Amino acid sequence: MQGAASHDAAAAAAAAAVLGGGHGVPRWPRMVFLVGAMTCLAISATAHLLACHSRRASVVFWQLDYAGISAMIVASFVPPVYYAFLCHRPARVAYLSAISALGALVVGALLSPPCSSPRFRRLRAALFLAMGLSGVVPALHALWLNWGHAACYLALSLEVAMGLAYAAGAWFYVSRVPEKWRPGVFDVVGHSHQIFHVLVLVGAVTHYVAVDVLLNWRETVAAACSATS
C-alpha cells in the first residue's frame, strides 16, 4: 500500500512538473504544427506563383519549398510525441531531437543544386517519405506505453490514414499520373501536382484531428502520469 502511494505521489509530482504547476495541458505543441503547416503551404503558394520569374528565382523558390516541406514534417512530430510521451521526458526529448536532426540533414541535402533539380524528384519524395516513416518507432513505443487507452488507438488509426494520404500524394508527385496518360488534357485541372496538394491537405487535416484526440485524452486524464504508467 505504501509503495503504491509513493508511486502515485511521484507520478503526480512528475505530472505537475510537466504541466508547470497544474495549469492545464500545454497547447503550444499543437501550435507548432499549425505554424509549421501554414508556413509550408504559404511558401509553396509563393513558389508556385513566383518561380517562373527567372531561372535563379526558380532554383531559390523550389529550394525554399523543399525546406518548408521538411519543416512541416518535423513540426508534425511535435504534438503527438509531446502528448504521447508527456510523462516520459527522456523518450520525448530523444524522439524530438532525432526528427529535428533528420530534418536538418534532409534540408541540407535538398539545398544542394543537384538534389533540387527536376531529375531528382524521386529522391526528394523518398527522403520525405523516410522522414515520415521514422515516426513508426515512436508510434509503436507510445502504443506500448499507453496500451489500453482507446484514444491512443484512435489517434494511431488517424495517423495511419494521414500517412496513406501523404504516401498517395507522393506517388502522384513521382508518377505524374494522369497527365502522362493523356498529355494536354489535364494541363489546367486534374493533373498530378494538384492531386498531390489536395492529398497533402487531407493528410494535414487528418493529423490535426489525431492531435486533437490526444490533447482531449490528456485533458480527461488530467495528464496524470499514473494514468499511463
UniProtKB/Swiss-Prot annotation:
It is a multi-pass membrane protein. The chain crosses the membrane at residues 5-25, 31-51, 67-87, 93-113, 125-145, 154-174, 195-215. It is found in: Membrane. One of its GO terms (cellular component) is membrane. GO terms for biological process: response to hormone; response to sucrose. Residues 26-30, 88-92, 146-153, 216-229 are extracellular. May play a role in abiotic stress response. This is Heptahelical transmembrane protein ADIPOR2.
